[in-house]
């Protein structure tokens, strides 16, 4: 293998696309909190001081989508009219209908649920980090989350909600990360802060505390490369739900089937199958059966079982690959109902996933981040 670089990005919760993801998942949570069997597919668009919420909801829950959206916007930090987008004054248009009866015909299958759509879905894990995520996206999320923490706790009071981070990692001939090539931090800021204060604050308060083990003399550090980032969030860019797929998953280090997650209830295999694929792949790596694992699933709308389960270990497997695939098929449930139950997806906690990645978040208690099936996998593969 030749030496190469891998680049991944993360964004803060105030990024316009992430504002939309959080509004969509906030509405989903509001429905699921009252009616765990809610069918939800909600999309959000923000532009200027306007938010548009549209989609399909079938539920017994009584929710106020506009009120939920305003609460999410305020919690993110858009609570000041000076930002050009704020929770109190923004205009919100809603267009929510019930789920198509044709889709419901395929999903509601008596005791079992059929898949809410067709598609291929991927899960990935590798041994580069303690949480079994690729290190470029892991570091990028760490930096973007720290940007938000420094804003929220007042350490860097001139920070504003929007921000982006990009990390480029060098990999050696052995395929292992060997150095940090560059890091880019673009942080929205108050107009009054001078550049020296901004650069010093971001280097000392954000970059160095998280990357000191990786920083080298040759590492390039770029901070607000345009020189100014005052206008940000929806005031600066239009945001749409589901437009940060690589941020949500593995930073481009694994394949992606193209389906977004946020705003979709658990019958939507775009979300549930991707979570289950991560769960299985992570347990394969945690069991020591492979250093890298990518699991692919395919479903057809209305069908209970997957059309395909495929396991790729990229030559890093420690036992025969066919045995790993057979064990994965046996240990994990692959029906739609089985995945929902195993992953505890009838609970209102989807908004937690909507910023800083859906994977690698071990502090959030997500079932798909647990490695509780690794022992069973190992036993099946080595007996």
From Swiss-Prot:
Keyword Metal-binding set for record: yes
PROSITE patterns registered for this protein in UniProt: ADOMET_SYNTHASE_1 (PS00376), ADOMET_SYNTHASE_2 (PS00377)
Reaction(s) catalysed by this chain's protein: L-methionine + ATP + H2O = S-adenosyl-L-methionine + phosphate + diphosphate
Residues the entry annotates as binding K(+): 43
GO terms assigned for molecular function: ATP binding; magnesium ion binding; methionine adenosyltransferase activity
Region annotation Flexible loop: where it falls in the sequence: 99-109
The keyword Lyase is assigned to this record: no
Annotated Gene Ontology cellular component terms: cytoplasm
InterPro entries hit by this protein: ADOMET_SYNTHASE_CS, S-AdoMet_synt_C, S-AdoMet_synt_central, S-AdoMet_synt_N, S-AdoMet_synthetase, S-AdoMet_synthetase_sfam
Binding site residues for ATP: 15, 162-164, 228-229, 237, 243-244, 260, 264
EC number, UniProt record: 2.5.1.6
Role played: Catalyzes the formation of S-adenosylmethionine (AdoMet) from methionine and ATP. The overall synthetic reaction is composed of two sequential steps, AdoMet formation and the subsequent tripolyphosphate hydrolysis which occurs prior to release of AdoMet from the enzyme.
Protein name, as recorded: S-adenosylmethionine synthase 1
Organism whose genome encodes this protein: Rhodopseudomonas palustris (strain BisB18)
């Amino acid at each position: 293998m030749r030496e190469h670089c891998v680049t991944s990005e993360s964004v803060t919760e105030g990024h316009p696309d992430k504002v939309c993801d959080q509004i969509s998942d906030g509405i989903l949570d509001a429905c699921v909190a009252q009616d765990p069997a809610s069918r939800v597919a909600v999309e959000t668009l923000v532009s200027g001081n306007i938010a548009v919420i549209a989609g399909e909801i079938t539920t017994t829950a009584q929710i106020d989508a506009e009120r939920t959206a305003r609460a999410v916007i305020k919690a993110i930090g858009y609570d000041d009219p000076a930002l050009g987008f704020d929770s109190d004054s923004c205009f919100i248009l809603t267009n929510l209908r019930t789920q198509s009866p044709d889709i419901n015909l395929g999903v509601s299958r008596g005791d079992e649920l059929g898949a809410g759509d067709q598609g291929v879905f991927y899960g990935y894990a590798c041994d580069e980090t303690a949480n079994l995520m690729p290190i470029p996206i892991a570091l990028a999320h760490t930096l973007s989350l720290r940007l938000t923490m420094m804003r929220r706790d007042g350490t860097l009071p001139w920070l504003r909600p929007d921000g982006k981070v990009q990390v480029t990692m060098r990999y050696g001939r052995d395929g292992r990360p060997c150095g940090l090539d560059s890091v880019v931090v673009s942080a929205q800021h108050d107009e009054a802060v001078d550049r020296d204060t901004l650069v010093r604050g971001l280097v000392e308060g954000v970059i160095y505390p998280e990357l000191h083990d990786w920083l080298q003399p040759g590492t390039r550090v770029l901070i607000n490369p345009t020189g100014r980032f005052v206008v940000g969030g929806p005031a600066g860019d239009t945001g749409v739900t589901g437009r940060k797929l690589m941020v949500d998953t593995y930073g481009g280090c694994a394949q992606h089937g193209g389906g977004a997650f946020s705003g979709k209830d658990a019958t939507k295999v775009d979300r549930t199958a991707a979570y289950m694929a991560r769960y299985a792949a992570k347990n394969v790596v945690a069991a020591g059966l492979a250093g890298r694992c990518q699991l692919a699933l395919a479903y057809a709308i209305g069908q209970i079982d997957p059309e395909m389960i495929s396991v790729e270990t990229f030559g890093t497997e420690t036992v025969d690959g066919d045995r790993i695939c057979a064990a994965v098929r046996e240990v994990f449930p692959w029906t739609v109902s089985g995945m929902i139950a195993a992953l505890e997806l009838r609970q209102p906690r989807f908004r937690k996933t909507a910023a800083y990645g859906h994977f690698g978040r071990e502090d959030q208690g997500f079932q798909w981040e647990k490695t509780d099936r690794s022992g069973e996998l190992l036993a099946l593969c080595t007996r």
